[in-house]
């Protein structure tokens, strides 16, 4: 299975039309090695027909995302394999393709008792956050920030109610990630919403087509070895 999959991916990646659609810094050998390793470690993926599996894997190649490093997921769903960038992958795409160059993207949860304020000052967004040290108070919301090279920022905020609404529509709402790492999952939700609001200048038509696929972007992970991509 591994050798056959590697050969199929190599053949696909060497097609002239595909080569033109890949990112300029794409590492074919590393992508094939990491992707084959991922499929070998996942029984559900290894059982999928290659006709269903390979198209999902190729979406990661077109975007320059690494499945094995948790930048994107190939998710068995019925008789299909669904592709989805992780929040780590969304951050990478935003940094690589933002029309307005970025220096950093980060997110925090806000707990009861933390000092938090966001607004506009002189036409520029701002955020002020002072968390209580070692606080285990209830989470009341989350925010994410994109910092631009020109000094500006973009802020996304979500209340606890909005975060929980996102959880309810997630296919993973009963999974271990939400149960044991809710803070990380809240950060994931708000970062993904932030990244979707950043204007991207994709290199190829194929990349733009994948990013415009609402199902690919909005779908939630079921059960993946590392749900946070870290």
Range-by-range predicted roles:
Residues 2-201:
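Binding-interface segments
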């Amino acid at each position: 299975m591994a050798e056959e999959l590697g050969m199929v991916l190599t053949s696909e990646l060497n097609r002239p039309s595909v080569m033109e659609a890949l990112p300029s810094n794409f590492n074919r050998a590393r992508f094939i090695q990491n992707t084959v390793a991922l499929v070998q470690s996942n029984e559900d993926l290894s059982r999928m027909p290659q006709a269903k599996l390979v198209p999902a894997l190729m979406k990661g190649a077109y975007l320059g995302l690494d499945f094995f490093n948790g930048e994107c997921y190939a998710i068995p769903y019925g008789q299909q394999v669904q592709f989805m960038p992780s929040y780590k992958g969304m951050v990478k795409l935003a940094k690589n393709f933002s029309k307005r160059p970025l220096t950093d993207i980060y997110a925090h949860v806000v707990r009861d008792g933390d000092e938090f304020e966001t607004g506009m000052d002189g036409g520029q967004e701002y955020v002020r956050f002072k968390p209580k040290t070692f606080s285990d108070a209830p989470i009341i919301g989350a925010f994410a920030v994109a910092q631009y090279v020109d000094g500006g920022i973009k802020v996304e905020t979500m209340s606890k109610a909005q975060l929980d609404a996102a959880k309810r529509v997630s296919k993973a709402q009963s999974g271990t990630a939400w149960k044991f790492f809710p803070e990380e999952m809240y950060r994931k939700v708000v970062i993904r919403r932030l990244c979707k609001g950043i204007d991207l200048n994709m290199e190829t038509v194929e990349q733009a087509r994948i990013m415009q696929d609402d199902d690919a972007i909005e779908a939630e992970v079921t059960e993946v070895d590392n749900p946070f991509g870290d």
